A protein has these predicted regions:
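Charged interaction scaffolds used for protein-protein
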Residues: 1-74, 81-136
Length: 136
């Protein structure tokens, strides 16, 4: 999700608003299909409730153990140690991908069907080439 929430830079002469990748991608983009996860609803709910990261002076940072413990107690989640470790790990991964994925051409970390993704990217590059020929 960090990849989807990252905001790639705009072209230098653009005046458009810089938006997260999830709002810029077409609805048919293969990277928008999230993996199906069974049996971890408590972990996913806790991660969503947490806000994914903490905001610091230098940008997004992973959730601290104190934040996760406070969330567990205040929201009455009753997470065990394994679940809390997963929330922490997800927060670390989210931060890493959020920071690394700010470049435009960074591929998604996961796609459901690689062939669909490859086909989609090929179609996009063909469209871009045609657009450059029409509007040089």
């Amino acid at each position: 999700m960090g990849w989807l929430h990252a905001s790639p830079p705009l072209p230098k002469n653009s005046t458009a608003e810089r938006l997260p990748r999830c709002r810029v991608l077409e609805s048919t983009h293969p990277a928008l299909k999230m993996p199906h996860v069974d049996g971890c609803n408590d972990v996913l709910s806790a991660f969503n409730l947490s806000g994914y990261v903490m905001s610091g002076g230098m940008g997004a940072t992973p959730l601290t153990w104190q934040e996760i413990q406070s969330l567990n107690e205040s929201a009455g989640l009753f997470l065990g140690s394994w679940s809390m470790r997963q929330v922490r790990s997800m927060s670390e991964s989210y931060c890493r991908l959020l920071n690394q994925s700010s470049e435009k051409d960074i591929p998604p970390p996961w796609v459901d069907n690689y062939e669909d993704y490859r086909r989609y990217m090929l179609q996009q590059s063909e469209r871009n080439m045609l657009a450059r020929r029409i509007n040089p």
